[in-house]
Amino acid sequence: IENNNSHYEMVCKLENKFKAWSPAVFIGYNNIAFDEEFLRNSFFKSLRDPYLTSLNRNRRSDLLGLLRTLDLFFPNKIKIPKNERNRKVFKLDQVSPFNGIEHFAHDALGDVKATIEIAKRVAKKAPEIWKACLICSEKSKVLEFLSENLIVFFSETYFGKTTGFGGSYLVNHPIYKYPILFDLSFNPNDFLGLSVKDLKETFLSGQKFIRTIKHNKNPILLTMAQIENSGYFEKTDLKEYKKKSKVLDSCPSIKENIIELLMDLAEEKDLKEENEGSQADIMAEESLYKGGFPSLNDMKIKQDFFKANWQERYNLCKKFTDKRLSYFGMRLIYEEFPEALPKKTKKEIHNAIKIQLSSINKEKWNTLGDFNKEIENIEKEDTNNSENDVIRELKNIHLYLNELYR
């Protein structure tokens, strides 16, 4: 990627490269929670396919989740450093050198090289877990795995603490379609006779007897045979898990009640969101998961948009029925070839950006005031003046934006 590319040009080149690699497994480090979200939204705003890395036989995987699961169940495979409070640290720039991998100063290319090296070591030292990671990088394979194994084992991380669970697959969420598992640390007999109302009260009281598997986010699922070699669970607990799973398997009524429970919780969640703010409060830039998918006709217009010149793209933007796509298209023309816009439209977009950037309130986006504070923070932290060139360049950009939108 050349430095003089615009954001749109960079996104187009990334898309072309990813398509050239496809079908592929796209692996990163904390990429599903961070990099992938940034990438998806960048593609979305550029009228490209935001789900490119998970469609058309493409899959995605996250090495951070794999390391957390591996360290929990098989802690001697990869070395994980600890901080001064004796807590394990999974930051890439610390895990890499701790395992003898040069990290290349935590720049983008260095992160890629370090991720590749860690992946190679996991594949060599824990081939079964590596295989499980690759299998679970595909949604359909996760569902197959759950249906084929009466008991599965997985980990969850909250506030830096990773915990292991054994669970039995019950149902898919009636709204969100995620697989729902019964947590086998609970006794299913305690729940079989409960009404939906009682199940709900029990769940909301803090007894989280059901667990959600985000099957589109590369969960690492392990079998009983794999976990028996771990030592994380007591053998007596594993025997009890087998008995509990058989109880669940023989009682379909609990699955029906769980579906009703999930429906109730989802309806309450929707009602709460409606009371807190309507769909009208959601900006186009944050609507990737909230505004639905484009119609077939809008998808066709998107394809025409890619092939057209900038003059033709303005007329295509007016044909979108999805107002978000029209908005993004107009913004792209404003940024890339503003001469193609009528003066009134160009002025409206310019003023909208000006209002956003000049706001002195706490906003969902970065304002010029936020930008200036970031520059000041970099200056304070740069005690040896090693970032002088970067700071100078950032100040020039800030000055340019101030003059452009004053």
Predicted regions and their residues:
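Exposed alpha-helical structural elements
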Residues: 13, 91, 125-128, 141, ...
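Acidic catalytic cores of enzymes that act on phosphate-bearing nucleotides/polynucleotides
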Residues: 135-214
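Helix N-terminus capping/helix-initiation residues
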Residues: 6, 183, 195, 251, ...
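Conserved DEDDh/DEDDy metal-dependent 3′-5′ exonuclease domain
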Residues: 1-74, 228, 234-241, 245-246, ...
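C-terminal non-catalytic accessory extensions
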Residues: 341, 345-406
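Metal-dependent phosphoesterase core characteristic of DEDDh/y 3'-5' exonuclease domains
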Residues: 1, 18-127, 133-136, 298-339, ...
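Structured mid-domain segments that build the active-site/substrate or prosthetic-cofactor binding neighborhood
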Residues: 204-247
